[in-house]
């Protein structure tokens, strides 16, 4: 597409029956922006309630806990899912939220981008993958994951089950807030991740026969653990 951009755009203009417009096109300055009004007055507790209600519709479990009980909350989910082998991101938030000892367990593998192929295989074999959410959309029950060296996509994609740890401060009403923040970061010259994933619960597919099938393109079960920030 990038290589043939001019040809493509010329063809579109021709089909429209006019010449190419290469100047004088301005982005509309909208005076009304309703996308930012939805739930803008909601407190973090209200957003948690919205998230929890939405997650009942997307087959996603939601747990709430405090930092000092986070490791126990994870253990409870592992037991509930009968999951043993774990793979996690290499993310400083695991230490910040008191999970240093959890990462040192024998059955826990921590992502290392220098061992990509081996870790992809480990992710395929893992019972459960655990990451932190960078943003969380209450309206749609979506966690947003920003890729990075220690934050391999395989961790949330390949294991049988998935846990997203959601710091309460990451909750926003909807996608509007996240896209605006990412746009502002890009406009200020900040380099954005090469991959930004929006994950709404376990893998659901019903696009062929209109019958819901879970786990075709990812984990068959997902749990969001909402945790109070330090």
From Swiss-Prot:
A family per Pfam: LUD_dom
InterPro entries: FTHF_cligase-like_sf, LUD_dom, LutC, NagB/RpiA_transferase-like
Annotated GO biological process: lactate metabolic process
Role description: Is involved in L-lactate degradation and allows cells to grow with lactate as the sole carbon source.
Family: Belongs to the LutC/YkgG family.
The name this protein goes by in its record: Lactate utilization protein C
Species of origin: Halalkalibacterium halodurans (strain ATCC BAA-125 / DSM 18197 / FERM 7344 / JCM 9153 / C-125)
């Amino acid at each position: 597409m990038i290589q043939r951009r001019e040809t493509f755009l010329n063809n579109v203009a021709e089909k429209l029956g006019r010449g190419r417009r290469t100047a004088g096109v301005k982005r509309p300055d909208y005076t009304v922006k309703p996308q930012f009004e939805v739930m803008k007055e909601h407190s973090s507790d209200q957003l948690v309630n919205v998230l929890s209600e939405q997650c009942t519709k997307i087959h996603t479990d939601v747990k709430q806990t405090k930092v000092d009980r986070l490791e126990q909350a994870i253990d409870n989910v592992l037991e509930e899912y009968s999951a043993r082998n774990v793979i996690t991101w290499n993310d400083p938030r695991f230490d910040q939220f008191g999970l240093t000892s959890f990462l040192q367990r024998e059955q826990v593998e921590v992502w290392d981008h220098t061992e990509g192929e081996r870790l992809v295989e480990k992710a395929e074999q893992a019972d459960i993958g655990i990451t932190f959410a960078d943003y969380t959309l209450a309206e749609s029950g979506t966690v947003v994951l920003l890729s990075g060296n220690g934050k391999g996509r395989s961790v949330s994609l390949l294991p049988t089950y998935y846990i997203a740890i959601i710091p309460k401060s990451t909750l926003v009403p909807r996608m509007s807030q996240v896209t605006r923040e990412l746009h502002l970061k890009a406009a200020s010259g900040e380099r954005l991740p090469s991959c930004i994933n929006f994950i709404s619960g376990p893998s659901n597919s019903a696009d062929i026969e209109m019958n819901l099938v879970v786990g075709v393109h990812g984990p068959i079960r997902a749990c969001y653990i909402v945790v109070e920030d330090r």
